[in-house]
């Protein structure tokens, strides 16, 4: 019950931009709790010589609790800054491990609810909406997580979603996607094909989570 429309561009922007997954793999990105830990903010250090792209809804797992990126942004090279986030694991506030990319993004419903508050620059107010959306997802999928972690919901349907992804390919000049689910439409567009390719599976994986 989902329709996917590719967004193509024969003249993409030739920009050298680092994505978060690659940054972690290459050891060029460090993500940590702030010196005084707070739910709504984490520190991101970009040690690369290229700008680092953080995408709205992208999840990092570990530290005191899993978080999702509060809004899309570019972090300049050799820069360390605090960034706005939302908690995606309501039932944990104890250190687990260093942050890493969780390989998942918030599902489209969670991103949509969060965005309604973020338009008013209210990350704190959006936190309740994020938790409510994750709870709704657990009910929808008849799943359970001891810490109400968004990531746990995805891991329990990983095989089903992997089979689902096999039906969708990527065009050579594709830079984004439009997804229609029932009466809702969403889209994500990137500067070029290589960036979109890094996020393609993640976006489709969570479009109908």
Describe every region a protein language model picked out:
Residues 91-138:
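Terminal connector regions
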Residues 42-50:
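Asparagine-centered strand-capping/turn motif at beta-strand->loop junctions
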Residues 64-97:
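Intrinsically disordered, low-complexity Pro/Gly/Ser/Thr-rich segments with frequent PxxP/GP/PP motifs
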Residues 50-58:
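Short, hydrophobic/aromatic beta-strand segments
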Residues 120-182:
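Charge/polar-rich, low-complexity and marginally structured segments
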């Amino acid at each position: 019950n989902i329709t996917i429309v590719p967004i193509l561009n024969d003249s993409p922007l030739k920009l050298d931009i680092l994505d978060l997954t690659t940054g972690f793999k290459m050891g060029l990105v460090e993500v940590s709790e702030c010196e005084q830990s707070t739910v709504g903010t984490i520190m991101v250090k970009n040690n690369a010589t290229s700008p680092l792209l953080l995408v709205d809804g992208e999840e990092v797992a570990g530290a005191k609790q899993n978080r999702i990126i509060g809004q899309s942004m570019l972090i300049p090279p050799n820069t360390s800054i605090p960034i706005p986030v939302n908690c995606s694991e309501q039932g944990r506030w104890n250190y687990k491990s260093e942050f890493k990319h969780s390989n998942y993004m918030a599902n489209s419903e969670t991103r949509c609810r969060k965005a309604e508050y973020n338009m008013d620059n209210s990350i704190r107010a959006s936190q309740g909406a994020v938790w409510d959306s994750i709870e709704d997802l657990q009910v929808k999928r008849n799943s359970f997580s001891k810490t109400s972690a968004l990531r746990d919901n995805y891991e329990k349907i990983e095989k089903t979603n992997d089979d689902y992804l096999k039906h969708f390919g990527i065009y050579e000049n594709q830079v984004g996607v439009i997804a229609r689910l029932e009466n809702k439409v969403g889209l994500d567009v990137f500067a070029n094909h290589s960036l979109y390719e890094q996020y393609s599976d993640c976006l489709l994986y969570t479009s109908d989570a």
